[in-house]
Amino acid sequence: MTNWFNKLLLFYFFIWPPLTTSEQSDLNDQRPPENRFDGEFLDLDFDEFDEEPSWRDNFVIRVSHQIFGQVNSHQVEPIPDFKIHKSASIENHRTGINVRYQNAIAPGWLIQGSWQGRIYWKEDYEYEANNNRIEDEYRINEIFVQRSTQGQSFRLGRQTVVWGETVGNSVLDVINHNEFRDFTIIDVEDTRLNQWMLLWDVFDKESSWSTFINLYPEFNPRPIRGGPFDFDLGYEINPVDRGNDPIFEIGSQWRRSYGSSDISVMAAYLYENQLRYERPIFPSDKANPVKNDYILIGFSANRAVRKLLLTLDVAMKRGVLIDGSTFVGVGSYNTPTNVKKDQVGISLGFEYGITNYQTVSLGVQLKKMKDERAGLSEEQVLSNQGVYGSWLFRYGNRLKNDDLELSLTLQGDLEGEAALLAGNAAYKINDNWTAGLQILTIHTNGTSELQYYKSDVRLGAALAYSF
């Protein structure tokens, strides 16, 4: 653990950006993308607020109902000679309400927040995990107050900070933690969880400096009880021990525009979002989660060439733990929790506007650990060796005057052992009603950790009312 003196030096380094006296041209363009509601797979556009003064104008409310399940009865063999029959079943049967609030309470002042509630009905995995009783859940997703002045902006509250240029697959998108609950949410943009932060932006005509401070870092939550990613480990897990030393995260990013290009340089002191776990010695004991702090140095750039946007992200991490399980939200139980390494990661991508209504993008992420075998015994096997990573392909099309939106997502690992295909369609019936369909299938080869989901086919439908 980095000692307190080093943390204090890092705090001083990150919090003191260069001064500027130029006016801010457009504060809204500098804001990071808003965290989407958990469980949403419809790409819905909220109506603009009415200009007439009314308390109701500051709210947007959406009520939705969703059914989603695995429809292909088949057999899988996650372990050699161990076969499991999988029957078609409903996984998600739930009603949701999402509330978004935004109010410019005074010149230069903004309050924004979002809240969600869920009711889990019969056949939903959370209903079954709750002893076959209706379950409900409520939480605040985002809430912050922002103060904007000439050339500066301060924002305090639960929010997200996103670094990197490669959409959906950037090695720099590591600040906020994530939660993959089930297969209705596969895009990283939809999985980011808000954290309590102070964000300070300083703007110049062609450049900006952004600094964040997180005084209570959080970690990727364990898979939801009863969900498709929840497996019986044979023992319980202790809560995170934050210890007596202060735990915080801090980072800064400098960004500059050069005509059709942008470059960014960033540095941060962070905690790994994914915990590792120490396997208990006795079955009656609980596993202890291991948190780890590290230093991130990054660089990103983009270049626009007519309808084509090229992106590059580079991340150098010093003092990260060995990558173990690649399974979402699970972490690792079989790799050492006391061996730190340095890692280099690169993301390459492009986005292309085929027409005003069609877009396509591709992002590739590559990682490499330095001296990955150093400090390990011959018996210890690494899940990821050499250069490893993932790829992500997306296609989007808007039809019928934007009333029908179609999207296709393909993603997999570089080794070719696993691939996921998802298709979505959202139809705007009128100004209030929207209907959506989703299909998702998984294909695996070799020793992929997704063998349990091999040949799964999932279908879903949702109906939403917004006002």
Specify the residue positions occupied by each region the protein language model found.
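Extracellular loop and loop/strand-boundary signature of outer-membrane beta-barrel proteins
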Residues: D81-S87, E126-R133, D182-I186, Y235-V240, ...
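Hydrophobic, lipid-facing positions within transmembrane beta-strands of outer-membrane proteins
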Residues: H93-V99, Y138-I143, N194-L198, F248-S252, ...
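Outer membrane beta-barrel
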Residues: Q102-G227, G259, T444
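Transmembrane beta-barrel strands of outer-membrane/channel proteins
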Residues: I61-V71, G113-I119, L156-R158, T211-L215, ...
